[in-house]
Amino acid sequence: MTDFIPTTDLSDAQPQAQVAAPVLRDFGGRTRFQGAAVTLRISENNPLVRQTLQTPGAGRVLVVDGGGSLNCALLGGNLGVFGVENGWEGVIIHGCVRDTAELRELDLGIRALAAHPRRSGKLEEGERDVPVTFAGVTIRPGDHVVADEDGWLVLGAESP
């Protein structure tokens, strides 16, 4: 893993970095995380999140475009445990999470819009490894995502 460089330093040194709007909250036990993006586009159904977190993360970050839905949670404690067990660095969700007390105890970076007690649907639909856009940034599979106490940003796949 590359040494961690804070988002403030990256933003100053790399003006091409896409800095995300500060609309996501921190829910994970790890505040600082980084890695290559794996992307999903889903709508109020989380089987693709489960399937992805059950595969080796190899230090990557799962980026989920849930359409900004505030109707249900796309990640909870059980799926968070899969992320830790399989070596994921973090999960960024344009949607909601639940089981927030459990998520806070996990060694996993987690950003999401809000907490919601309702679970998602279980239809296996959505897209994987597609560009996703939310919070004012576009994330492509393989882009380098960096998150810390000051926010999160996206660098091209060739960046550290």
From Swiss-Prot:
Gene3D superfamilies: Ribonuclease E inhibitor RraA/RraA-like. It catalyses: 4-hydroxy-4-methyl-2-oxoglutarate = 2 pyruvate; oxaloacetate + H(+) = pyruvate + CO2. SUPFAM superfamilies: RraA-like (SSF89562). It is an enzyme of class 4 (lyase). Divalent metal cation. Keywords: Lyase, Metal-binding. The keyword Metal-binding applies. Its cofactor is a divalent metal cation. The keyword Lyase applies. A divalent metal cation binds at residue 99. One of its GO terms (biological process) is regulation of RNA metabolic process. One of its GO terms (molecular function) is oxaloacetate decarboxylase activity. Its EC number is 4.1.3.17, 4.1.1.112. It comes from the Bacteria. Catalyzes the aldol cleavage of 4-hydroxy-4-methyl-2-oxoglutarate (HMG) into 2 molecules of pyruvate. Also contains a secondary oxaloacetate (OAA) decarboxylase activity due to the common pyruvate enolate transition state formed following C-C bond cleavage in the retro-aldol and decarboxylation reactions. Belongs to the class II aldolase/RraA-like family. Homotrimer. This is Putative 4-hydroxy-4-methyl-2-oxoglutarate aldolase.
